[in-house]
Amino acid sequence: LELANGLRIFPGMETDVAEGGHILSIGPLEAILELNRRLEPHKEKETFPPLADLLDLLEQYPVLVGCAHPFRAPGRVPEQPMEQLRRFHFLDLNGKDMPQDRARTQRLTQALGKQLAIPVVAGSDTHQAVQYGCISTVFARGCATVSELWGEMQAGRYTIEVADQAPFQV
């Protein structure tokens, strides 16, 4: 879906894991809807899936998998075994964290991305309309499909832009 202002919207969801933290998946609408249905029994804190189990499930679908705001407390995803972390396609540099401690958030997230050799892209963590656009990933080329999006991420053909008003948006 592409909006009049050029914003592309790809289906996705965020899933809580037992270790603490949030895992993102982006892919075809049918895959996201089916994953959401299959994860229905695991949406309460005491039933969150372990990271390894969730990644096993996600690997059965044509989705990109990322770690949302990896260094936000109380998340513990970066402390998980390296063999699990290497299963991520990308990390999220999250807009909600930027106004609080931008230097730390960027330093830690970029360092983990480099260690894992995966892209770090922006996520606005938009739960309310005012938060939209506090941080953006701007791609050099248009992406109409998830595979095109992944190709541009892998090629590094994007910039991350933080809005001047971000501290007031989140």
Model-assigned labels for residue ranges:
Residues G66-C67, D92:
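Conserved beta-strand positions in the central sheet of alpha/beta enzyme cores
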Residues M13, A68, S124:
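Active-site flanking residues adjacent to catalytic metal/cofactor-binding acidic residues
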Residues G12, F48-D56, R76-M82:
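Short, charged beta->alpha transition segments
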Residues I23-P62:
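Binuclear metal-dependent hydrolase catalytic cores centered on His/Asp/Glu-rich metal-binding motifs
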Residues L1-E2, P50-G66, T109-L116:
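Surface-exposed amphipathic alpha-helices with a cationic face
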Residues L1, L39-P41, V170:
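Charged, glycine/proline-rich intrinsically disordered loops and linkers
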Residues L3-R8, V17-L33, A73-V170:
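Charged catalytic cores and adjacent phosphate/nucleic-acid-binding surfaces used
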